[in-house]
Amino acid sequence: MGRQRRCRWAQPWTLLLLLLGPRLLVTHGWRRKGDKNSENTNILELYLPAVVEYALHVYNMRSQDMNAYKVVRVLRSWLELSEQKEEKGLVFSMELQFARTRCGKFDEDIDNCPFQATPDVNNTITCFFTVDTEPWKTEFQLLNDTCLEGSAE
């Protein structure tokens, strides 16, 4: 009788492990509560797209070129630790590569505009931006921007 009772207790646990086994393998990795790198990575993943869009918008508005530029790729990005009182949000630094498009910078659908493919014109720009932002309020402030014509490669 005692043996039967152990089997009855073992069966629900075995069934539970079989049912949850695949889910346990797919769960996110454990992180220490104060792990800054994990926190920064999550913040970058969440807010970087909006900050990149802002930087591109600023570049297009300040550019003397009548054509719009689009992001080719994010070369590097990181979250700065700010100790200045006037910087109340998150401070992102990023190096972006832009390329000239066939569309004007005031056209409606720049996102779907093809890149310009003229070999005699250098249509690639590499820029470094530092942006202070409170993206949850859609507030952005450009702290630094430096651009160079040509590829960063």
UniProtKB/Swiss-Prot annotation:
- Say what the protein does: May play a role in hematopoietic differentiation or inflammation.
Annotated Gene Ontology cellular component terms: extracellular space
- Protein name as catalogued: Cystatin-9
Question: Per the UniProt entry, what species is this protein from, by scientific name?
Answer: Bos taurus (Bovine)
- Pfam families for this protein: Cystatin
Gene Ontology BP, a term: antimicrobial humoral response
Q: Where in the cell is it found?
A: Secreted
The GO molecular function terms of this record are:
cysteine-type endopeptidase inhibitor activity
Q: Which residues form the signal peptide?
A: 1-27
Q: What family does the Swiss-Prot or TrEMBL record give for this protein?
A: Belongs to the cystatin family.
Sorted keywords for this record are:
Protease inhibitor, Secreted, Signal, Thiol protease inhibitor
Q: Which PANTHER family match?
A: CYSTATIN-9-LIKE (PTHR46945:SF1)
Q: Which InterPro entries does this chain map to?
A: CST9-like (IPR043250), Cystatin_dom (IPR000010), Cystatin_sf (IPR046350)
- Coarse class of the protein's main subcellular location: secreted
